[in-house]
């Protein structure tokens, strides 16, 4: 009997579309794989033969339970431990400079300590490029950082807000590092680990820097102000990962080994600054090897506007950014790279007639993506790489037999590729109840008729009459746990 030919030699099987059952399993388990790229917002250019390595060094984290599950699955399928190990290379997106291998073996993060950009590279901005694959050569994809601005050197002039891209705004993230005697090997970074602040030589923390009113009292809750950070102002440093916070601080400009008490210009990238612990007797945030301590400054007898500090109390400040990419193989391993990973930045609801439309704005959208509400696939229309539209499903898709919304129903919004890759968005859509459908229109019309309304990036609300309401996500009150600094 002749063999049955099922396809051309070397032909790849067609991609498996995601099933409702597979989506339900994903929503229950949430075994995501996440790639985090943490980096500074600016990079100092290197001239001639010098190599000014990026500081703090870009860092790649592999987060989520999916990495371990993927490794276990590959080893069950016959891969060796080495073949199931993720591998990564990082570069500055320039073919003239070789990509550098990141050592991820045995841990979920790695830093790229020897990246630099030379003066022969004329770009004013660039993005880091992280290429990832498994040890058996299966491709994961190429992940890009956020945009990084190239600067020649830190500005020594009195900064003005005309150069706003070099200034530091309240509520943004910064890294702080200390370098004794300008030696790269002595660099230590402010970091939180095990519930304590410490000075790490290996990992750096990203801290929200919040501007406070001068009369704001110490407490776990505090009211923050908008605007750019100026020297002499009261600030709060809050770890972006743990929520741990330092006591209220006054940020002061550093000149050589002195803190200037009367400086009031805007804080700029890569400036050296000191942090005075408010309402103390000249105590400053300081490091002593790995410990974070308080250091008491000495008054300058001839210059009352200055206080003498030691090297450990002088910190270099720089703004940081984060690129985050999350994916899950909903129908098992795929042949194509998971990148580009779509990122949703905002939602806008548009309604009319019996149909409510949701517009998604973001990056890396492709025609092979569909929007899902919970375990329901929505009719999706691709516009361009930054915009997609979808039809909001009827409430009956989630609650069988319901003709109108009886109680609030919240469903997650995800994007799904045509080969079963699920991209989590952290967005939810909420159906809000009403007494019942209007007598003069159909149930679907009562549920879905909508007025246009802007929806914040993390939640969308609708009631069954179709009037959509905004949900405020911006709060000026920040809660944190205050860490005590050792004296």
From Swiss-Prot:
Residues 452-487 are annotated as: Disordered. Disulfide bonds: none annotated. The modification N6-acetyllysine is found at residue 162. It is found in: Nucleus; Cytoplasm. One of its GO terms (molecular function) is DNA-binding transcription activator activity, RNA polymerase II-specific. GO terms for cellular component: cytoplasm; MAML1-RBP-Jkappa- ICN1 complex; nucleus. Residues 469-487 have a biased composition (Low complexity). It comes from the Eukaryota. One of its GO terms (biological process) is positive regulation of transcription of Notch receptor target. Residues 452-468 have a biased composition (Polar residues). Residues 44-54, 152-157, 179-184 are annotated as: DNA-binding. Residues 342-432 form the IPT/TIG domain. Its main location: nucleus. Keywords: Acetylation, Activator, Cytoplasm, DNA-binding, Notch signaling pathway, Nucleus, Repeat, Repressor, Transcription, Transcription regulation. Transcriptional regulator that plays a central role in Notch signaling, a signaling pathway involved in cell-cell communication that regulates a broad spectrum of cell-fate determinations. Acts as a transcriptional repressor when it is not associated with Notch proteins. When associated with some NICD product of Notch proteins (Notch intracellular domain), it acts as a transcriptional activator that activates transcription of Notch target genes. Interacts with activated NOTCH1, NOTCH2 or NOTCH3. Interacts with MINT/SHARP. This interaction may mediate the recruitment of large corepressor complexes containing proteins such as HDAC1, HDAC2, NCOR2, SAP30, FHL1/KYOT2 and CIR1. Interacts with EP300, MAML1 and PTF1A. Interacts with RITA1, leading to nuclear export, prevent the interaction between RBPJ and NICD product and subsequent down-regulation of the Notch signaling pathway. Interacts with SNW1. Interacts with CHCHD2 and CXXC5. Interacts with BEND6 (via BEN domain). Interacts with NKAPL. Interacts with ZMIZ1. Interacts with RBM15. Belongs to the Su(H) family. This is Recombining binding protein suppressor of hairless. The lineage of its organism: Eukaryota, Metazoa, Chordata, Craniata, Vertebrata.
């Amino acid at each position: 009997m002749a063999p049955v030919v099922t396809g051309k030699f070397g032909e790849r099987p067609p991609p498996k579309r995601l099933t409702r059952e597979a989506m339900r399993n994903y929503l229950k388990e949430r075994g995501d794989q996440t790639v985090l790229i943490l980096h500074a917002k600016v990079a100092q250019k290197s001239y001639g033969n010098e190599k000014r390595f990026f500081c703090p060094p870009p860092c790649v984290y592999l987060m989520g339970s999916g990495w371990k599950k993927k490794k276990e699955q590959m080893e069950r399928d016959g891969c060796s431990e080495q073949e199931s190990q993720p591998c990564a290379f990082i570069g500055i997106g320039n073919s003239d400079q070789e990509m550098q291998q990141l050592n991820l073996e045995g841990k979920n993060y790695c830093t790229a300590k020897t990246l630099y950009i030379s003066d022969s590279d004329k770009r004013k901005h660039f993005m880091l490029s992280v290429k990832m694959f498994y040890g058996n050569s299966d491709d994961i994809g190429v992940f890009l950082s956020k945009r990084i601005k190239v600067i020649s050197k830190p500005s020594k002039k009195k900064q003005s807000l005309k150069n706003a891209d070099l200034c530091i705004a309240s509520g943004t993230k910064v890294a702080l590092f200390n370098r004794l005697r300008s030696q790269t090997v002595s660099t230590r970074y402010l970091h939180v680990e095990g519930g304590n602040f410490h000075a790490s030589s290996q990992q750096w923390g990203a801290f929200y820097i919040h501007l406070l009113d001068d009369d704001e009292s110490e407490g776990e809750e505090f009211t923050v102000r908008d605007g750019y950070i100026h020297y002499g102002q009261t600030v709060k440093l809050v770890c972006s990962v743990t929520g741990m916070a330092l006591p209220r601080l006054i940020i002061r400009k550093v000149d050589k080994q002195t803190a200037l008490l009367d400086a009031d210009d805007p804080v700029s990238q890569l400036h050296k600054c000191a942090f005075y612990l408010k309402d103390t007797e000249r105590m400053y945030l300081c490091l002593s090897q790995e410990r974070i301590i308080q250091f008491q400054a000495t008054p300058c007898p001839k210059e009352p506007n200055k206080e003498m500090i030691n090297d450990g109390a002088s910190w270099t400040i720089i703004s940081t950014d984060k690129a985050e990419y999350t994916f899950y193989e909903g129908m098992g391993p795929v042949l194509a790279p998971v990148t580009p990973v779509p990122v949703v930045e905002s939602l806008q609801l548009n309604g009319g007639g019996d149909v409510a439309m949701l517009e998604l704005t973001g990056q890396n959208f492709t025609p092979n993506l569909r929007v899902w509400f919970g375990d329901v696939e929505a009719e999706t229309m691709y516009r361009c790489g930054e915009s997609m539209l979808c039809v909001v499903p009827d409430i009956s898709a989630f609650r069988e037999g319901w003709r109108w919304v009886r109680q609030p129903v919240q469903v997650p919004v995800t994007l799904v590729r045509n080969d079963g890759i699920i991209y989590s968005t952290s967005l939810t859509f909420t159906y809000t109840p009403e007494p019942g459908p209007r007598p003069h229109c159909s149930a679907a019309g009562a549920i879905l008729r909508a007025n246009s309304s802007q929806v914040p990036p993390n939640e969308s609300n609708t009631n069954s009459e179709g009037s959509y309401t905004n949900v405020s996500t911006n709060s000026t009150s920040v809660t944190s746990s205050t860490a005590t600094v050792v004296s």
